[in-house]
Amino acid sequence: CSSDLAVAVYLDAWHRDLPEFLQLRTNNGDDRMKAHDVFPAVCYPDLFWRLAEENIDAPWHLMCPHEILTVKGYALEDYWGTEWEKRYLDCVNDPRIEKRSVTVKDIVRLVLRSAVETGTPFAFNRDSVNHMNPNGHTGMIYCSNLCTEIAQNMAPIEHISTEVHTENGDTIVVTATRPGEFVVCNLASLSLGNLPVEDEAYMERTVETAIRALDNVIDLNFYPLEYARLTNQKYRSIGLGVSGYHHMLAKRGIHWESDEHLAFTDAVFELINYAAVKADTALAREKGRYALFEGSDWQTGAYFEKRDYTSEKWRALAKTVAVQGMRNAYLLAVAPTSSTSILSGTSAGIDPIMKKFFLEEKKGSMLPRVAPELSMDTWWYYKAAHLIDQSWSVRAAGLRQRHIDQAQSMNLYITNDYSMRQVLRLYLEAWRAGVKTIYYVRSKALEVEACESCSS
């Protein structure tokens, strides 16, 4: 996935070139081996995190995927979960496949060193993603996008044939391809800081409007690539997200580092998800279901079972979905909204604010930023991102993730007093909580600063 001359490249945690890949953006080493406009991301299987938690000195074997395909006749990257683990161990035990053996600790050190120094690699927990994929019956999710919030089925474009013709003296080469699955982001965000999130009826109407608008985008959009149009019309995937998360908490007098925060976010995102599913199945009744609905987790009810939606209203909605279908294959994805949140006068995405007031550089311009609706009533609820205990952010992300069928752009904010062990603990906590992706690790040197309250 690319944007503004940058590209995100995802590599499996067992890939032979992983150590070099993890040093693409670091400041030391051979500059000829650097790619500073590449944003590296790593796809982790559950096995890696289990070993990091239980036996970090365990061996970890890096292999060439092409060699595996040649020797074993299958692509290891085409599997996930227990089937992947079985085939991984099969490859490890096959003497015909060359291994670059290190320890889990070696890889963890490289990952964390790069994360602290450069903010990357992004983390993609592939087994968690695919276990919760509502459309696993038709494919697999291999990676995410540049902002780590998209999680949709992917498949490569396949070459079928090439024919050479001569017409009127001109040579024409005709290439036939199978289109694969070319993921497109159709995104919008709810400005939580400006919405009465406690009003269930109001939220349902708002979400219904957003879902309908995003569905219309699919039909009205211009597609420069035919592959994108075909995939978009087959899955009709959308990504409704949020902005103004910290704004929402501060307006209600909720501290970020509190159990009240966790309970509130769980309730809000369950409401958003319920409203989205309800609106989408109604849209399916009106306009028709997406082409691959049959056999999906939506149709079988597995979507609701995996998320432990057992209340009477959820059970009733699951029955309605099974009968009416769904208009869109994927519904929710929380993007960063770092620019659009400025226009909306709210905080970015699901992030805590950087400071109560600061200067931010955007496209070469310095913009003064003030926490939204900053007043004596909200002042003490706007704690700066780098001062927040990140375990609260991770726990909140885990609660939100249950209600988000795709992923969320979730950043970690650390200072230089964090040890590598503490950062690893955050990754492990996120994995255990079911968080699908981690975006940037935003580090900041500790500075001796005057108290904002006093200096103001």
For each of these PLM feature ranges, what is it?
Residues 9-17, 42-43, 65-73, 125-137, ...:
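A glycine-rich phosphate-binding loop feature that marks nucleotide/adenosyl-phosphate handling sites
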Residues 13-17, 211-219, 231-253:
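Core structural elements
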Residues 148-152, 214, 218-219, 303, ...:
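Catalytic alpha/beta core of large soluble enzyme barrels
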Residues 206-229, 255-337, 426:
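Internal maturation/activation junctions in enzymes
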Residues 11-14, 21, 63, 124-127, ...:
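Generic beta-strand/beta-sheet core signal
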Residues 3-8, 29-31, 89-97, 172, ...:
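Glycine- and acidic
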Residues 1-7, 179-184, 197-222, 277-281, ...:
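A structural-propensity feature for long, helix-poor, extended segments
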Residues 1-189, 196-197, 223-227, 276, ...:
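Active-site cavity-forming subdomains of large catalytic enzyme subunits
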